[in-house]
């Protein structure tokens, strides 16, 4: 057994851990050990580096923990996929590369919780900007010199993108030129974490590439954190496994848990921090009975509403093996072409009811009919909308199964447990059909493939959701930030009741944000990094942002009405 000592030990080199490792080692006198259970982010592996290949990492276990849920009681008892990234970059190494920050009111809502007053949107915006380099340059809402490369959608990529945005506007919803700017609500182009050379912009590329040469940062891959060590109520180190070898590292200052919304509560529970009754079931000595560890688990569900495409403009030919070498060669040599995009270049956010305070439904538009993980491709030209609700009231949990760090925990999201879930999904399907009926899509829209035109009643729509809805891969909130009885960490990520221990990742969100989670997770880590370093928080940015204030969710007067038979 080997033993080393560092100022900070970070468990997990993902979207948050790499940010902390990079920012903390900007101070040359600070030493950091970064532990990652997966391997390197191999730059010659097209599966993780080519944006268009985003489905491939989810199909194996080299880069994916490939968790499964317990049977979900409201989803036909399906065991549902729960992919999480494994390797330098974490889930930013295998995600869909959609750069969505969330709605301003997400953060303003967080700030209404006791003790979280400094998490308003205007407090968070400087850290979004700090992390970002946007290809069209900085402005009041965007950064121009950060580690994360953000690419904007360019005109003429595929006519279906513009047609689907136009259809949303024709249906009476707003148009927005920037889903991360003044107004998230509406339809428009989608920003993506892709470099100017057409490569995935993971946090390993953006952050670790600048930090890994520093002598005060040690990165250890294939290192699975087993337990956090404690001296009384103070975290003092970590034991971890590299193959059959066990090692121990001691932390002079803090242990920083950045393992994600599944593995962070798992590591805490295995270390004796969590619901006391759960720990006693496995004979784990209780360091602190903290009931919220693993509770409050949230995610986004989504469906694929799919249509036949009457014109040969979809990505269907690119799915054929004989066309892929040319696509791959252009991407490899020039960083251009179909391989250089994740093809989520347009989308949007809407409110389905006028009394919704901010958008409750998200859209990703895709010019092909296929599942996110590459399965169930429709053998024809097609297109689809990924659509799902944003802030489900349903809550789940992550619970340890055993003391073995190699065993996956018991995961139950408890999807669709509340009546509001069902109402929002029915509303979403009907709103999507209304959008797809608009004149902008007349030349492209063929028959509805899924759910199918005959699926109309509430009962039929509910059956489709139970059988076909899937995760959007956004687990979060399982070690929530706050000060109520179920809160795990304070506003700086410090675990309540303990010293020298923080959690910094998507698990500390009190409520899931409106959209994809990679950008918010990076922001959270940037913000808390300043707290750890004892630096003054970046000044609030005083910019306006859209608030509906009871405005109509959809302008019916401007909508183009189309018969339902179209």
Curated annotation (Swiss-Prot):
Organism whose genome encodes this protein: Burkholderia lata (strain ATCC 17760 / DSM 23089 / LMG 22485 / NCIMB 9086 / R18194 / 383)
Catalytic EC class: oxidoreductase
Pfam family, one: GMC_oxred_N
Gene, per the UniProt record: betA
Cystine pairings recorded for this chain: none
Family annotation (InterPro entries): BetA, FAD/NAD-bd_sf, GMC_OxRdtase, GMC_OxRdtase_N, GMC_OxRtase_C
Keywords: FAD, Flavoprotein, NAD, Oxidoreductase
Segments for region (Disordered): 180-202
Bilayer-spanning residue ranges: none
SUPFAM superfamilies in the record: FAD-linked reductases, C-terminal domain, FAD/NAD(P)-binding domain
The EC number(s) this enzyme carries: 1.1.99.1, 1.2.1.8
The protein's role, per its UniProt record: Involved in the biosynthesis of the osmoprotectant glycine betaine. Catalyzes the oxidation of choline to betaine aldehyde and betaine aldehyde to glycine betaine at the same rate.
Binding site for FAD: 7-36
Pathway where it operates: Amine and polyamine biosynthesis; betaine biosynthesis via choline pathway; betaine aldehyde from choline (cytochrome c reductase route): step 1/1
Cofactor dependence: FAD
MF GO annotations: betaine-aldehyde dehydrogenase (NAD+) activity; choline dehydrogenase activity; flavin adenine dinucleotide binding
PANTHER family for the chain: CHOLINE DEHYDROGENASE, MITOCHONDRIAL, GLUCOSE-METHANOL-CHOLINE GMC OXIDOREDUCTASE
Entry annotated with the keyword Nucleotidyltransferase: no
Active-site residue list: 474 (proton acceptor)
The protein's name in its UniProt record: Oxygen-dependent choline dehydrogenase
GO cellular component, one term: membrane
Catalysed transformations (reactions): choline + A = betaine aldehyde + AH2; betaine aldehyde + NAD(+) + H2O = glycine betaine + NADH + 2 H(+)
Family under the similarity heading: Belongs to the GMC oxidoreductase family.
Biological-process GO terms, alphabetical: glycine betaine biosynthetic process from choline
